[in-house]
Amino acid sequence: MRALRKIHQALVPGGVLLDMHPIPPPTRAEVGGRSLGEFDDAEFWEIVVATEAPLEATDLFALEGEIEFDWLERYDSGAELLEDLKSWEGLRVPRALATRIRKAEPPVDLWERVVLRSYRARR
């Protein structure tokens, strides 16, 4: 809650806070639009819910709108994707999927469904 108050204070009156994060279905690896498999991100969803709860409970911001869309991030190799995923909190790469990613012909894409929400600061 402290962080939300600081953000609120930093915004100009009526300023906008943008929040973008993945939403279900699970994130997956793809090659040429073909799925290699889904990541285990159940723990990540728990983190998202816990993180969003204070924003939804506060009277500092009013939700103005949201849009959902597909987000693709391209990697030059499967190894590069797997290395990047090591820093992702709450995401686990199943062993069989990691093998498929390593063997995949590059480029390898990370596919996510995301939501972008716009909140207006209340005064």
Located regions from the model:
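A short glycine-rich, Lys/Arg-flanked "PGG" loop and its adjoining helix->strand segment in the class I
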Residues: 2-16
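Conserved class I S-adenosyl-L-methionine
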Residues: 16-47
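Acceptor-substrate binding/catalytic loop of class I
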Residues: 35-52, 67-75, 89-92
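Conserved Class I S-adenosyl-L-methionine
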Residues: 58-123
